[in-house]
Each structure stands twice: as structure tokens, then as C-alpha cells.
Amino acid sequence: MNFEWDAHKAASNLAKDGIGFEEAALVFADSRRLTLVDARHQTEIRENTTGMIAEILIVTVTHTERKGVIRIISARPARKRYHAHDS
């Protein structure tokens, strides 16, 4: 998989949520990840993928796909409702 992101947004995300986009991309290696369409956005298809990084951190990554490249928009620790993913 190929990834891209805006460098300023990545720095802002790291400062706000403590997760870098390079680290967030590891969610896509989790075979148990869950991806849902984010219906709030109508200008492009955005998805939220929740999965584990290094078997210790559950993260939700908001992303879109452009010309076969996954563009990471944001990443944050998953909310409690997603922690059932690990059961």
C-alpha cells in the first residue's frame, strides 16, 4: 500500500493526538482492522479504519483514496466503543 498526507496536518495531528501519520499507516497491517464509510463527507469518499498498532494501541485513521494512494487525513486513539474490536 502507498500512503500520502499533508505535512502540516501530520504535525498538527501529532501535537494534538500524539499519533504520527507514519505510525498511523501501520493500522492497515492489522488483519482484524475494521473500515467504515464516513457518511458525513459528501465531496469525497472518506473512510474510518480502526485497528491495532504493535498490538498495544487501538487507533482510528480517517482516510480517502486518490489514484490508488491512501491519503491519511487524521489519526487518533480509538474511542471506547471501538475497543470491542480487540475481543
Model-predicted regions and their roles:
Residues 1-87:
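Ribonuclease/tRNase effector modules and their secretory precursors
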